[in-house]
């Protein structure tokens, strides 16, 4: 089971469950909607994964810990001050039921990480559908290197970004990509989804390789120019 729970203005809390095992929760922007969903599902929780320190990903941590004090909360070093109980910057997490790969994807923040659970990539604000995160406390080289790491994953990888930014990203992609047919087709799909108040996500790495200009960038210089152009688009 994979579910994108809308939160705040345009965030998603991702919930992943293999068969009838306990849930994995990715990022905690808020808890009211999450607690209501968990109660309705009568769910048990294996772990929480935090991708980075920004408030719109962590401001629900305190309330979550009060309600679920024994659930481990994994995140990079920068998330320790936000309430993460287990620091992970790279490597593997082995829980009772899951093996989780931790992939460094800094740039948006210095220590941003992404998580690969089975074939599901939870990439926070590193990779979006048809886009990528802004560079804040990290740098362009970090962001480019992180996206290059993600770009080595298989086509069938299910990509689960943290924000509903797809339409705006597709609009930019149409202005910079030479081959636009896949972008135009995806834009029609996403417009239909959003008109029905449905998520445009998840996506796949196969599709992103066709519609995401940041994954097509071959050099740091090309990537940096694209990112700066998107910043003022």
Swiss-Prot record:
SUPFAM superfamilies in the cross-refs: Metallo-hydrolase/oxidoreductase
One GO-annotated biological process of the protein: methylglyoxal catabolic process to D-lactate via S-lactoyl-glutathione
A Pfam family it matches: HAGH_C
Organism superkingdom: Bacteria
Description of how the protein assembles with itself and partners: Monomer.
Family: Belongs to the metallo-beta-lactamase superfamily. Glyoxalase II family.
Keyword terms: Hydrolase, Metal-binding, Zinc
Metal-binding in keyword set: yes
Record-given protein name: Hydroxyacylglutathione hydrolase
Native source species: Haemophilus influenzae (strain 86-028NP)
Required cofactor(s): Zn(2+)
GO molecular function, one term: metal ion binding
Pathway the protein takes part in: Secondary metabolite metabolism; methylglyoxal degradation; (R)-lactate from methylglyoxal: step 2/2
Native organism taxonomy: Bacteria, Pseudomonadati, Pseudomonadota, Gammaproteobacteria, Pasteurellales
Keyword Zinc (UniProt): yes
Binding residue positions for Zn(2+) 2: 56-57, 125, 163
């Amino acid at each position: 089971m994979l579910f994108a729970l809308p939160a705040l203005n345009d965030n998603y809390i991702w919930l992943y469950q293999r068969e009838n095992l306990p849930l994995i929760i990715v990022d905690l922007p808020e808890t009211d909607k999450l607690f209501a969903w968990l109660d309705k599902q009568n769910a048990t929780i294996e772990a929480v994964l935090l991708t980075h320190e920004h408030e719109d990903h962590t401001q629900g941590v305190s309330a979550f810990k009060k309600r679920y004090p024994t659930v481990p909360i994994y995140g990079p070093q920068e998330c320790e001050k936000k309430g993460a109980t287990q620091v992970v910057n790279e490597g593997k997490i082995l829980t009772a039921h899951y093996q989780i790969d931790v992939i460094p994807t800094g740039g948006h923040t210095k220590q941003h990480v992404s998580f690969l659970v089975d074939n599901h990539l939870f990439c926070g604000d590193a990779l979006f559908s048809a886009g990528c995160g802004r560079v804040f406390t990290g740098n362009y080289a970090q962001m480019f290197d992180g996206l290059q790491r993600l770009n080595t994953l298989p086509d069938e990888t299910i990509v689960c970004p943290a924000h509903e930014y797809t339409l705006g990203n597709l609009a930019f992609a149409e202005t910079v990509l030479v081959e636009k047919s896949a972008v135009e087709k995806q834009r029609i799909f996403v417009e239909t989804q959003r008109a029905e108040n449905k998520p445009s996500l998840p996506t796949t790495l196969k599709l992103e390789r066709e519609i995401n200009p940041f994954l097509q960038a071959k050099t740091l210089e090309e990537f940096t120019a694209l990112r700066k152009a998107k910043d003022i688009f």
